[in-house]
Swiss-Prot record:
Region (Spike body and stalk (antigen domain)): 248-479
Annotated stretches, region: Spike head: 65-224
Disulfide partners: C318-C380
Full protein name: Outer capsid protein VP4
Keyword annotations from UniProtKB, A to Z: Capsid protein, Coiled coil, Disulfide bond, Hemagglutinin, Host cell membrane, Host cytoplasm, Host cytoskeleton, Host endoplasmic reticulum, Host membrane, Host-virus interaction, Membrane, Outer capsid protein, Viral attachment to host cell, Viral penetration into host cytoplasm, Viral penetration via permeabilization of host membrane, Virion, Virus entry into host cell
Region spans: Spike foot: 510-775
């Protein structure tokens, strides 16, 4: 049936999320571990998985073979092999340190007898004696001179068929490959000044880091890999590699989008969070041997620090949630040491730190999205506290430690003595650390966690470093600061939208086709089908459903169900959570309703008031005992679905309120019926009550005792066609006993037959119910 949407919302209405905990932290500091989820609950807590998102990686990944580069003159970087790959004979490269070393490398083709060849070296024409006896290998010859006017002499040779040679500057030396491939090896020959030695290459070359010397040796002896495996297909200028390192701006304001009035600003900030715990130690009256309470308290802390050369004034508020209560009792005598209650934070606890500073990022923190943070961990270690007894040695509680790890960030408001500040609430999960805490001269020892007795360990503060990022919608005029009080306009705008939407919803009632409504009321509408027809929200069904469930949890229907089942933990644990229809056989709700009915009938003198209160509970019983008959909730859900599809003003913001409000206000004048053989009992929320025979519709006296017993054992039915309508129908048209029973049980097929036959009495009744679906 269509009321499945309400059942699904109820089954998920007990899910708790982080925003609930954030809203309740100010009023509920201690969290009880006991959870009573109710018969419709699927889980106690929603899965929450916080992450820091993508982090920039500063790791430098160097290619093994960097190049090829175009022929050029450069100051070769230290600890890099310059692998030269000439394509023809002649001068390959030359270099100098401009003082006492000039060196040159030439390439000689195979089968060259001892001969004189002319080369241009250091700007001069030079005659050099070269030769190459090999018929297959090319020969690299290294020449060196020690003075500007000196003569080049042969220093080393490398024979290879691959036409590859390499040298490197390292430790004020020049390293070079010599010998013959495939057994060529590196060696050094020169002592030079690395800073002032330039190299001029007449051929394409590659750069290989010194850490990859083994790979360079492999290239020299075996040749380069195929060209498509190298980094640059087309040789580039070496200057393209010499890009200056630019330090990223850690704290920056980036304009994401901008219009004439508004702009989106992304604020990236480094942050230093300093906080401290506060505690309260209360001593009991009497002889002075007992303490009543040691507890955590919220603590405000203000400080300044330097961020990117700017002094920042920050304000933090530290509070805890989910504390664990411990106690120690040394005996029953008045002089026995005892602590009635002392708080300890452990793995199941959370620490909240609200942070605000006077930077630009917090000036207009009203409309915020894409909030993220990345923070370091911090260890909080407990100190010692001596319990001063009137006589005897003083017990000392000492030790205890926890590690705080970032678990998320949300928006919050800090309330100081003077102002309220829109701030960031950083949520930390805890892990216990060494050492454990103990109370000396007692048996209490080896307990892990951080007790409230001295959580700061006499330190001025705890400090956490990190960074956060957020995108805020601010006015284009930077001189205008959005007042914090203006944040209430968000709700005011929502109320205005809801008002307009209510008017539209109420006006749509007359556009609903009665026959189609019955068909829709018999469909099992789930949350997806309920929302999928709304424009621009198909992609957002998941997030919208979450918001609707959160709002529905506070509706009067959800609260009534919660009250009805507050003492049903055993029944709740036996309910199959995979199907809402499995709730149809609960016995305890019936007993509870019966007990409530009995109490009402005995305690109240006004029968009309009795019946009105009973009828309200009968709706809850009908809701927990789903049948195949049509109910008021089926009709209200069908009307809601129809109006949602027709509405032009529905939105994700207004949807939660509309869904919850429809469950409370649609069809306020309801009547419920219990059929006992040939007798029907009918009661209304407005206080009306009838008892009549089902075959003649003749009214009979209302038997309270009989009705009270039937409430426990008989199913409750929605009186879609109430007693007055049935009697009018029978008097004017005449109906068979079978039709009467089907109308009494709100059979949708029979109802549709009467509507399709244009029966004015039935049609007017359904139209009256539709008109009651108002907000």
């Amino acid at each position: 049936m269509a009321s499945l949407i309400y059942r699904q919302l109820l089954s998920n209405s007990y899910v708790t999320n982080i925003s609930d905990e954030v809203n309740e932290i100010g009023t509920k500091k201690t969290t009880n571990v006991t959870v009573n989820p109710g018969p419709f609950a699927q889980t106690g807590y929603a899965p929450v998985d916080w992450g820091h998102g993508e982090l920039p990686d500063s790791t430098l990944v160097q290619p093994t073979l960097d190049g090829p580069y175009q022929p050029t003159s450069l100051n070769l970087p230290v600890d890099y092999w310059m692998l030269i790959a000439p394509t023809r004979e002649g001068k390959v490269a030359e270099g100098t340190n401009t003082t006492d070393r000039w060196f040159a490398c030439v390439l000689v083709e195979p089968n060259v007898q001892n001969t004189q060849r002319q080369y241009v070296l250091d700007g001069q024409n030079v005659q050099l004696q070269v030769s190459n006896d090999s018929s297959t290998s090319w020969k690299f010859i290294l020449f060196i001179k020690l003075t500007p006017d000196g003569t080049y002499t042969q220093y080393s040779t490398l024979s290879t068929p691959h036409k590859l040679c390499a040298w490197m500057k390292r430790d004020n030396r020049v390293y070079w490959y010599q010998g013959a491939t495939p057994n060529a090896s590196e060696s050094y020959y020169l002592t030079i000044n690395n800073d002032n030695s330039n190299v001029s290459s007449d051929a394409e070359f590659y750069l290989i880091p010194q850490s990859q010397t083994a790979m360079c040796t492999q290239y020299i002896n075996n040749g380069l890999p195929p060209i498509q495996n190298t980094r640059n297909i087309v040789p580039v200028n070496i200057t393209s590699r010499q890009i200056k390192d630019i330090r990223a701006q850690i704290n920056e304001d980036i304009v994401i989008s901008k219009t004439s009035l508004w702009k989106e600003m992304q604020y990236n900030r480094d942050i230093i969070i300093r906080f401290k715990f506060a505690n309260s130690i209360i001593k009991s009256g009497g002889l002075g041997y007992k303490w009543s309470e040691i507890s955590f308290k919220p603590m405000n802390y203000q400080y300044t620090y330097t961020r990117d050369g700017e002094e920042v004034t920050a304000h933090t508020t530290c509070s805890v949630n989910g504390v664990n209560d411990f106690n120690y009792n040394g005996g029953t005598l008045p002089t026995d040491f005892a602590i009635s209650r002392f708080e300890v934070i452990k793995e199941n606890s959370y620490v909240y730190v609200d942070y605000w500073d006077d930077s630009q990022a917090f000036r207009n923190m009203v409309y915020v999205r894409s909030l993220a943070a990345n923070l370091n961990d911090v260890v909080c270690s407990g100190g010692s506290y001596s319990f001063a007894l009137p006589v005897g040695n003083h017990p000392v509680m000492s030790g205890g430690a926890v590690t705080l790890t970032s678990a998320g960030v949300t928006l919050s408001t800090q309330y100081t003595d003077y102002v309220s500040l829109n701030s960031l609430r950083f949520r930390f999960r805890l892990a216990v650390s060494e050492p454990s805490f103990s109370i000396s001269r007692t048996r209490m020892s080896g307990i892990y966690g951080l007790p409230a007795v001295n959580p700061n360990n006499n330190a001025e503060y705890y400090e956490i470093a990190g960074r956060f990022s957020l995108i805020s919608l601010v006015l284009t005029n930077d001189d205008y600061q959005t007042p914090i009080a203006n944040s209430v306009t968000v709700r005011q705008d929502l109320e205005r939208q809801l008002g307009e939407l209510r008017e539209e919803f109420n006006s749509l009632s007359q556009e609903i086709a009665v026959s189609q409504l019955i068909d829709l009321a018999t469909l099992p509408l789930d949350m997806f089908s309920m929302f999928s027809g709304i424009k621009s929200t198909v992609e957002a069904v998941k997030s919208m459903t979450t918001n609707v469930m959160k709002r529905f949890k506070t509706s009067s229907l959800a609260n009534a169900i919660s009250d009805l089942t507050s003492n049903m933990s055993e029944a709740a644990s036996s309910v199959r959570l995979t199907s809402v229809r499995s709730v149809g056989t609960v016995t305890l709700p019936r007993a509870r309703v019966s007990l409530q009915v009995s109490d009402d009938l005995r305690s109240m003198q006004d029968v009309s008031t009795q019946v009105s209160n009973v009828s309200r509970n009968l709706r809850l019983k009908e809701f927990t005992t789903q049948t195949d008959t049509l109910s008021f909730d089926d009709i209200s859900a069908a009307v809601l679905k129809t109006k949602l599809d027709k509405s032009t003003q529905i939105s994700q913001q207004t949807m939660p309120d509309i869904i919850a409000e429809s469950s409370e206000k649609f069809i306020p004048k309801r009547s419920y019926r219990i059929v006992d053989e040939d007798t029907a009992f009918e009661t209304g929320i407005d206080g009306t009550f009838y008892a009549y025979k089902v075959d003649t519709f003749n009214e009979i006296p209302f038997d309270m005792e009989r009705f009270n017993k039937l409430v426990t054992d008989s199913p409750v039915l929605s009186a879609i066609i109430d007693f007055k309508t049935l009697k009018n129908l029978n008097d004017n048209y005449g109906i068979t006993k079978k039709q009467a029973m089907e109308l009494l049980h709100s059979n949708p097929k029979t109802l549709k037959e009467f509507i399709n036959n244009n029966n004015p009495i039935i049609r007017n009744r359904i139209e009256n119910l539709i008109s009651q679906c108002r907000l």
